């Protein structure tokens, strides 16, 4: 068995795998968030401000010519937040800092200039070290959005009405109206059209007329086509086309009228002449161009040729039929729409992509239209000349030319779903969009605000800045944008994945309802950039994905993945190159599994490699790059599944999603069978404490670790006062997460330990010795047990409960506010009227629960009384009040109590008033938060899962002595049904089982990296040897080891009929805990109008007895039961009160009355102006309200 021992976290693991791997390739997994936000502060804010600078303030000067003041915002600086992260969490504040502008004001007439600092701009929410934001006390994350990159796209679409194909050149800006050029290639309909702003379609040449091509020949010469005069088919097609070759013949002078050359004549007019002089080929106008021109003239130029202005007017009248078309206005509006960089913006990325896309078309244009002689050597030197971020005429003409050639060259079409055509908008860019939107609105009103200012010294720049509008924009973005999400904090992996999520939905993205299958599907360009496995199972499948483990985003937002450079069949392990999806297509790339010799050269002569989006066989000398590691295809979650290569994709998807739902356990264990990525997930989660410098541990307790720094020779480093330099690390203790989980850090070093820089010194939640530990290693057997593990149910041993194997701590927060009411302030007090003494036992003298108290449902946490409306007091009451004080005042109990179904220990109480939180809501005097920690042990109904999508619910908990046991007496801890494996095709769990058993027997931890892990034969051969050493060989076949063993029934001691597969499997407890879901209603609230019980656990509601359930009782003829269901138990108000009395007195139940829903129905019909009257059996009219 070939394994290499490596230290990961603070333990050693035996690594399988043949691919050499460097730790340096694993960058910070949250880098995308941190870098993007840093870029926003460092560059993007100023970038947005500069776009609107300088602001010009016109000044009317008496007697002189008018002058203007120029206001320029030169620089921006930021202040730290006035509250710490923890304060913001506790007090419900936003973690934000102030931004200030430096302003320069210039008098354009005199050149006088003044500068002012510290002009307050706004409060900007800051990102924490963990890559998240704290907004109103809640931790939130901004999800990265995957959007189509701006540029020009050539795509094939089916027409909605005819389902015929159509080729489209689509100009997609970051800001502005769409422009589409359409080419219908279907015979008889071959014509070029243009669609403006997704509205009307026009003849493309009408648009060119508007752009200034007023001469027919000027338009046709843009679309030349060389034809062979010997080709009869081509001749018949192009017979009526205009000749663009400039040929002179003597005979042309004799024509009527005389011609100087063939240029501009029809082909049929000069065909004989060309054949006479044996000319083999001639350039004519493209057939589609001829047809398009003909149709345009037929429709718009019946009498005379249109001018540019008239063409604009014609287009405008169709775009806005309600407005009066004026030629000049039409020209200005349409030109403004596409040729003004302020209204239409491709951005630098878009322009760059257009330059790459149309460069070849531009070279062809120079050769064919401009008649330039360009050799192949010169091609590389020719650059696309257009630099503007708006549309240019050349872009339009080249795109139309490109479209005409697409029919023959179908590879020239773009794939919408290729990652080269998509870019990532991270938090920085999304915040910039919000900032710019608010800032531009604010600047528009600047000249009005400063109108009438005569002196430069009287200009107040602060009056220009409306910081509230910018702060509102940020607040709305963080509070309500689809991309600002409540952080998924179930465990560190869930949090890490949330920060690396890619979403195709959101503003400017796709809509879930309209997203077709193709958009959601896996594409070859996702390799190493986007995980093909991790995505939700519901309506968002394929739209919400995760970044691959090594993917990073470049400055333009394109996803890149790393490769090693290969030259002359030699891999350069020191040369890592990041390639985007577009760049990757141009190279021959070998997979990471290609065998590399000790000297770094490729071993095999021929290697399967990717090139131009396909996989082919290449000689090793042709290989240009090689993948860095086999795991670069997957996300962090998927890379944590051992033997992923043996699992069906659907189950792997479930496995990676369920790991994110694993509850942090009280006693977590790192997996015996890992993949070697556990340390990475722990490192970048933000909860693992690592040593900042080399040092020796000086002091350790549950709340802090002190380390004295050492130099390379292990000598103590000292400061300027000759005191030892010490680092103090504070640990988080029992902090509540967004999902009510417990965040707790535990030291893993002892006093005297020497630690190196970056070494783990304290575990966070779901961690064990510096590695991610989401669950427990459980000794499992695959055998049916009395039907208790039917349909994925799980049988567990009492031993797991005794060991607290799946016990977890959950922290819930309950809060109350003491408000000012119209009748006086509410009061927090222990003096609560009409309450039993025992309910007050846990309260202190102020009426707030004591820390450490054990409370259960109904117990008072905070005593609070609210004043009631007092009627006019009688003289007697006044006398009582004057004698006994205010004891008889009219107050009601509004205390905070523990909700139904919750019990636990109070671990913290926080009390705030207006001094602590100046921004407390108006009318709130005191704000109290009580934290209760609940210990949840394993129970029937809890959901457990492995890492391979193998999930199930606990059906029974057996005594340890009743569990099946091994020949050496070891009992199993869990029994799974063997029928859960074959049809699910997740065989990875069986291999994990065998390797896990080997790990248990040898006390070694293993790592089997995905796509490069242990083979079945390696595991079986070693397991067979070790079993023999431990005398556990019963049931195994030495010639063909199968990993099975003879088990005995714990109840009878008899052996089972067949050997059973046993071993250690890593199991997780998911956050679907039976105790949180189980619920029964006794007496509870009713809805106001229908008077029926509310629904749902939160409202202490009942179970809905719906239409189909009524049918079921009808079918059984259970008339009385049905009657009760629809009256007493539902909405017969009078009836249910009578029943209560009858039950108390032991009498027979009364007859049911009329349900409230009947009365509601009559009221609704009356609301529809229908006169409803009710009569009894004797014909007497009844009053509905009195029934």
Curated annotation (Swiss-Prot):
This molecule's function is given as: DNA-dependent RNA polymerase catalyzes the transcription of DNA into RNA using the four ribonucleoside triphosphates as substrates.
Q: How does it assemble?
A: The RNAP catalytic core consists of 2 alpha, 1 beta, 1 beta' and 1 omega subunit. When a sigma factor is associated with the core the holoenzyme is formed, which can initiate transcription.
Q: What class of enzyme is it?
A: transferase
Provide this UniProt record's keywords sorted from A to Z: DNA-directed RNA polymerase, Nucleotidyltransferase, Transcription, Transferase
Q: Gene3D superfamilies, alphabetically?
A: 2.40.50.100, 2.40.50.150, 3.90.1100.10, DNA-directed RNA polymerase, beta subunit, external 1 domain, DNA-directed RNA polymerase, subunit 2, domain 6, RNA polymerase alpha subunit dimerisation domain
- Highest taxon of the source? Bacteria
In the record, biological process GO terms are: DNA-templated transcription
UniProt cross-references to Pfam families, sorted A to Z: RNA_pol_Rpb2_1, RNA_pol_Rpb2_3, RNA_pol_Rpb2_45, RNA_pol_Rpb2_6, RNA_pol_Rpb2_7
What family classification does the UniProt entry report for this protein? Belongs to the RNA polymerase beta chain family.
Source species: Petrotoga mobilis (strain DSM 10674 / SJ95)
Name any one GO molecular function.
DNA-directed RNA polymerase activity
* Name the UniProt record assigns to this protein: DNA-directed RNA polymerase subunit beta
Reaction equations catalysed: RNA(n) + a ribonucleoside 5'-triphosphate = RNA(n+1) + diphosphate
Signal sequence annotation: none
- Show the GO cellular component annotation of the record: DNA-directed RNA polymerase complex
Which HAMAP family does this entry report, sorted A to Z?
Answer: RNApol_bact_RpoB
Q: What is its EC number?
A: 2.7.7.6
Keyword Transit peptide present in the record's keywords: the answer is no
């Amino acid at each position: 068995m070939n394994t290499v021992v490596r230290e990961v976290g603070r333990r050693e693991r035996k690594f399988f795998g043949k691919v050499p791997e460097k730790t340096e390739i694993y960058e910070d997994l949250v880098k995308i968030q941190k870098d993007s936000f840093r870029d926003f502060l460092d560059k993007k804010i100023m970038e947005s401000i500069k776009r609107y600078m300088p602001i010009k303030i016109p000044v009317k000067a008496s007697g002189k010519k008018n002058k203007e003041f120029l206001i320029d915002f030169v620089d921006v600086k930021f202040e730290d937040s006035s509250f710490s992260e923890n304060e913001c969490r506790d007090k419900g504040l936003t973690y934000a800092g102030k931004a200030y502008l430096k302003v320069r004001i210039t008098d354009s007439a005199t050149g006088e200039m003044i500068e002012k600092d510290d002009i307050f701009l706004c409060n900007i929410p800051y990102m924490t070290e963990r890559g998240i934001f704290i907004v109103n006390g809640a931790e939130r994350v901004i999800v990265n959005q995957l959007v189509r990159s701006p540029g020009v796209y050539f795509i094939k679409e089916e027409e909605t009405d005819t389902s015929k194909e159509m080729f489209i050149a689509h100009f997609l800006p970051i800001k502005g109206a769409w422009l589409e050029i359409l080419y219908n290639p279907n015979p008889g309909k071959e014509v070029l059209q243009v669609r403006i702003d997704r509205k009307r379609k026009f003849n493309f040449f009408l648009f060119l007329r508007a752009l200034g091509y007023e001469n027919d020949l000027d338009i046709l010469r843009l679309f030349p086509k060389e034809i062979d005069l010997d080709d009869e088919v081509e001749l018949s097609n192009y017979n009526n086309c205009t000749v663009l070759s400039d040929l002179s013949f003597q005979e042309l002078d004799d024509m009527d009228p005389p011609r100087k050359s063939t240029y501009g004549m029809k082909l049929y007019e000069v065909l004989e002449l060309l054949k006479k002089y044996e000319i083999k080929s001639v350039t004519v106008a493209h057939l589609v161009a001829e047809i398009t021109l003909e149709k345009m003239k037929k429709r718009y130029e019946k009498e005379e040729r249109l001018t540019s202005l008239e063409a604009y007017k014609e287009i405008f009248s169709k775009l806005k039929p309600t407005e009066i078309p004026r030629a000049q206005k039409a020209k200005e509006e349409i030109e403004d729409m596409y040729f003004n960089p302020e209204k239409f913006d491709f951005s630098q990325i878009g322009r760059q992509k257009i330059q790459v896309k149309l460069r070849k078309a531009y070279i062809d244009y120079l050769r064919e239209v401009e008649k330039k002689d360009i050799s192949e050597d010169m091609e590389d030197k020719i650059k696309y000349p257009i630099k503007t971020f708006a549309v240019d005429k050349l872009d339009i003409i080249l795109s139309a030319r490109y479209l005409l050639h697409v029919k023959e060259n179908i590879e020239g079409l773009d794939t919408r779903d290729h990652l080269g055509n998509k870019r990532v908008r991270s938090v920085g860019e999304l915040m910039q969009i919000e900032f710019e939107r608010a800032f531009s609105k604010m600047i528009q009103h600047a000249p009005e605000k400063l109108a009438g200012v005569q002196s430069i010294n009287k200009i107040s720049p602060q009056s220009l800045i409306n910081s509230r509008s910018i702060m509102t924009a940020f607040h709305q973005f963080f509070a309500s944008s689809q991309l600002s999400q409540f952080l998924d904090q179930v465990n560190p992996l869930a949090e890490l994945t949330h920060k690396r999520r890619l979403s195709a939905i959101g503003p400017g993205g796709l809509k879930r309802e309209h997203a077709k299958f193709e958009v959601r599907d896996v594409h070859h360009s996702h390799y190493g950039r986007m995980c093909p496995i991790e995505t939700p199972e519901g309506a968002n499948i394929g739209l919400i994905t995760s970044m691959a483990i090594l993917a990073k985003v470049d400055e333009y937002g394109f996803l890149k993945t790393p490769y090693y450079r290969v030259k002359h069949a030699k891999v350069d392990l020191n040369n890592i190159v990041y390639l985007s999806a577009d760049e990757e297509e141009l190279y021959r790339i070998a997979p990471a599994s290609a065998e590399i010799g000790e000297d770094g050269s490729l071993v095999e002569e021929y290697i399967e490699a990717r090139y131009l989006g396909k996989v082919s066989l290449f000689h090793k000398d042709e290989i240009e790059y090689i993948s860095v590691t086999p795991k670069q295809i997957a996300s962090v979650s998927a890379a944590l599944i051992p033997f992923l290569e043996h699992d069906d994709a659907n189950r792997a998807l479930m496995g990676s999603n369920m790991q994110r739902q694993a509850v942090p356990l009280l006693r977590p264990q790192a997996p015996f069978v890992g993949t070697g990525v556990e340390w990475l997930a722990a490192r970048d989660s933000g909860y693992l404490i690592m040593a900042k410098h080399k040092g020796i541990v000086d002091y350790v307790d549950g709340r802090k670790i002190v380390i004295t720094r050492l130099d390379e020779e292990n000598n103590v480093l000292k400061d300027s006062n000759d005191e030892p330099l010490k680092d103090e690390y504070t640990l988080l203790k029992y902090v509540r997460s967004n999902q009510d989980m417990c965040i707790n850090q535990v030291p893993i070093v002892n006093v005297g330990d020497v630690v190196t820089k970056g070494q783990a010194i304290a575990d966070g939640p779901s961690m064990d010795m510096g590695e991610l530990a989401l669950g427990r290693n459980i000794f499992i057997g695959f055998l049916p047990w009395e039907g208790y593990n039917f349909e994925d149910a799980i049988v567990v041993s009492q031993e797991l409960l005794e060991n607290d194997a799946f016990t977890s701590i959950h922290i819930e927060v309950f809060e109350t506010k003491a408000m000012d009411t119209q009748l006086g302030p509410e009061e927090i007090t222990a003096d609560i009227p009409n309450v039993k003494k025992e309910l007050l036992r846990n309260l202190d003298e102020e009426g707030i629960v004591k820390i450490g108290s054990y409370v259960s449902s109904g117990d008072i946490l905070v005593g609070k009384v609210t004043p009631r409306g007092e009627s006019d007091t009688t003289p007697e009451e006044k006398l009582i009040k004057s004698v006994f004080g205010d004891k008889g005042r009219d107050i009601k109990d509004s205390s905070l109590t523990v909700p139904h179904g919750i019990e636990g220990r109070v671990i913290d109480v926080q009390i705030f008033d207006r001094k602590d939180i100046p921004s407390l809501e108006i009318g709130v005097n005191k704000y109290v938060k009580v934290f209760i920690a609940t210990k949840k042990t394993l129970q029937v109904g809890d959901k457990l899962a492995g890492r391979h999508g193998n999930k199930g619910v606990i059906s029974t908990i057996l005594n340890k002595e009743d569990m099946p046991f091994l020949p050496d007496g070891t009992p199993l801890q869990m029994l799974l049904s063997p029928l859960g494996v074959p049809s699910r095709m997740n065989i990875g769990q069986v291999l994990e089982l065998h390797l896990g058993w080997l790990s248990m027997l040898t006390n070694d931890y293993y790592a089997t990296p995905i796509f490069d892990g242990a083979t079945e034969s390696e595991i079986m051969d070693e397991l067979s040897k070790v079993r023999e050493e431990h005398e556990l060989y019963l049931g195994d076949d030495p010639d063909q080891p199968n990993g099975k063993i003879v088990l005995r029934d714990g109840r009878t001691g008899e052996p089972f009929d067949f050997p059973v597969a046993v071993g250690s499997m890593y199991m997780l407890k998911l956050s679907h805990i039976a105790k949180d879901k189980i619920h029964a209603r006794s007496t509870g609230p009713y809805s106001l109008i229908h008077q029926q019980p509310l629904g749902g656990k939160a409202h202490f509601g009942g179970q809905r007895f719906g239409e189909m359930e009524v049918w079921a009782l009808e079918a059984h003829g259970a008339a009385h039961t049905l009657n009760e269901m629809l009256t007493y138990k539902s909405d017969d108000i009078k009836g249910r009160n009578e029943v209560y009395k009858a039950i108390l007195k032991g009498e027979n139940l009364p007859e049911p009355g009329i349900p409230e829903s009947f009365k509601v129905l009559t009221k609704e019909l009356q609301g529809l102006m229908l006169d409803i009257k009710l009569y009894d059996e004797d014909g007497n009219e009844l009053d509905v309200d009195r029934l």
